[in-house]
Amino acid sequence: MWDDLSQYIINLAMENSKRTGWNTKIVEIGVGRFQSISNRLQENENIEVIMTDINPSNENVVKDDIFNPSMSLYENTDILFSIRPPAEIQKAIMDLRDELNCTLIIKPLFNEDLNIELKKMKLKNHGRASFYIYEGEN
C-alpha cells in the first residue's frame, strides 16, 4: 500500500515538474516516526521534500506547528500530504493548503472519516492505496 501511495505522489510530482520545468516541492505534515514515503520521494532528483512535525523525531524533520505554520517553510509548495493526521489538525492542514493553493493528499486511518468542512476531497484508489486528494475547486 505505501509503495502505491509513494508511486502516485511521484507520478504527480513528475507531471508537475514536466509542466513547470522546475523541481516539485512536497511537504509532509505530521510525519512522526513513519518516514518511509518521504524517504522514497527524496530518492527522485526532481523532488524536494520537507518533513514537518510538532515534535520532530530526528534531525531530518523540521519543527512546525500546523496551527501557526512558519510560512517560509511552505513557500512554493506544490504538494502537501499527511499520513493518518488526527481529526483535530485536518482543518488546519486544509487552511494551509488554501493559502498555498497546492495539491493536498490525506491518507486517513482505515476507518476514519475526514474532518474537513465544506471541501470536497476526492477518494482516490491507486493500486492498494486509498486516500483523499484535493486540487482546488474545478
Where in the sequence are the language-model features?
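Conserved S-adenosyl-L-methionine
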Residues: 42-48, 99-101
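A short acidic, Gly/Pro-enriched loop at the edge of an enzyme's catalytic core
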Residues: 71-79
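C-terminal substrate-binding/active-site "lid" region of AdoMet-derived donor-dependent transferases
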Residues: 87-138
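Conserved SAM-binding loop of SAM-dependent methyltransferases across substrates and taxa
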Residues: 33-45
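Adenosine-cofactor binding site in Rossmann-like domains, unifying the SAM/SAH pocket
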Residues: 51-72
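Residues in the short beta-alpha loop(s) of Rossmann-like NAD(P)-binding domains
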Residues: 32, 55, 110
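Conserved class I S-adenosyl-L-methionine
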Residues: 21-33
